[in-house]
From Swiss-Prot:
This is Inositol-3-phosphate synthase. Its EC number is 5.5.1.4. It holds the Pfam family NAD_binding_5. One of its GO terms (cellular component) is nucleus. Keywords: Cytoplasm, Inositol biosynthesis, Isomerase, Lipid biosynthesis, Lipid metabolism, NAD, Nucleus, Phospholipid biosynthesis, Phospholipid metabolism. One of its GO terms (biological process) is inositol biosynthetic process. Pathway: Polyol metabolism; myo-inositol biosynthesis; myo-inositol from D-glucose 6-phosphate: step 1/2. Its cofactor is NAD(+). One of its GO terms (molecular function) is inositol-3-phosphate synthase activity. PANTHER family: MYO-INOSITOL-1 PHOSPHATE SYNTHASE.
Amino acid sequence: MFIESFKVESPNVKYTEGEIHSVYNYETTELVHESRNGTYQWIVKPKTVKYEFKTDTHVPKLGVMLVGWGGNNGSTLTGGVIANREGISWATKDKVQQANYFGSLTQASSIRVGSFNGEEIYAPFKSLLPMVNPDDVVFGGWDISNMNLADAMGRAKVLDIDLQKQLRPYMEHMVPLPGIYDPDFIAANQGSRANNVIKGTKKEQVQQIIKDMRDFKEQNKVDKVVVLWTANTERYSNVVVGLNDTAESLMASVERNEAEISPSTLYAIACVFENVPFINGSPQNTFVPGLIDLAIQRNSLIGGDDFKSGQTKMKSVLVDFLVGAGIKPTSIVSYNHLGNNDGMNLSAPQTFRSKEISKSNVVDDMVASNGILYEPGEHPDHIVVIKYVPYVGDSKRAMDEYTSEIFMGGKSTIVLHNTCEDSLLAAPIILDLVLLAELSTRIQLKAEGEGKFHSFHPVATILSYLTKAPLVPPGTPVVNALSKQRAMLENILRACVGLAPENNMILEYK
């Protein structure tokens, strides 16, 4: 059975006019390696820590500024939200299609809330806590191309023509602000687009981005702004002591106009100084150590890296299944080809390397979890190939071959072929990222013994379900297994309304 909404009644939760207060007993374990009777052994000690959560239930008017607004993702998301807001339908060769938010975790997935008369009861994910309605989001942003969003939508060739015609009047007046352009960080083939750029030194560019965000907030009368990078993949920045390894060195490098400070890092700096959440949707190392240091100092939310949309999402499910089943993946070969501007930019070796790193690290934690299958330092052969084929446009092809060792020296090979509209997968993920980033800024918590409430750590691991290479605070383990990431996100939101984690034991029927 599916219900649209619910309210929790419990001694552990209290609803007030503007807040939800909850108490949650976090059950975990502590491990110690100690000598007992002359022999060292591992001791596992269960422990319980009481947490209090406080969630602001006032849903703000939200503005979203996209870096690369005029690209395939930006124009597709903007058009999709308008179509949903206006209730637009359009003819395809198969049927009359209604606008929807399929592919969005927050808008189109469900959570189990319990059982009733022997039947499982589910509710929308978005019913857990008050969230911004995507129909109410105000979009803006920057792009190195001055093409308006209606023409950009046509250039992208993602949405059906009948839908594009209906959206054009809403999008013709939407023109991106000038963006930061540095040809050293992206493929040379992007130069022909760059007719809408911010001039000046890196310090002046940061100041302009700050001004743009303030103007956008004032002109659109929004309460909060979230910024997300959906522009070209950049090459990796060199991390150098004295250049970008600390907040102080990073800001000094901006003052000196150092060439190695990337455009994406400049946007992130501007956002941190304005306390505006910044999310990196591409694989480059935008968050150099100095930027992470700066965000922690100023307690400003950052999240990333790289949208987890198709092939990598499948990989994080399949490898988790194989290793969890005691099967040993020994070779993973992933091949992609696509024909959109993302593929064109990735045809340059230096930008492809960023994507290769992002895609290749996704199985590391799963491999490390099983010392029966893998010796220390052992890892599957893992190859990623991306090719640019203009004809296929936004319809990305992904082919994977997984070779594994099974019982008694046997071999198993799984081959997958996935064809998908790249931007139609990415757009709802962008939506989820900005909505969850905004929501997380309204949640505060404190552990037993802490004097006052505080926000989540500014490095937003809560967003990891949606990213290929989750950004985590220094010293924090990286989790890539998809089911664990979703459970983490759902269970944190459940704790905010006093609900226990979904552990799937269902003891009442055992």
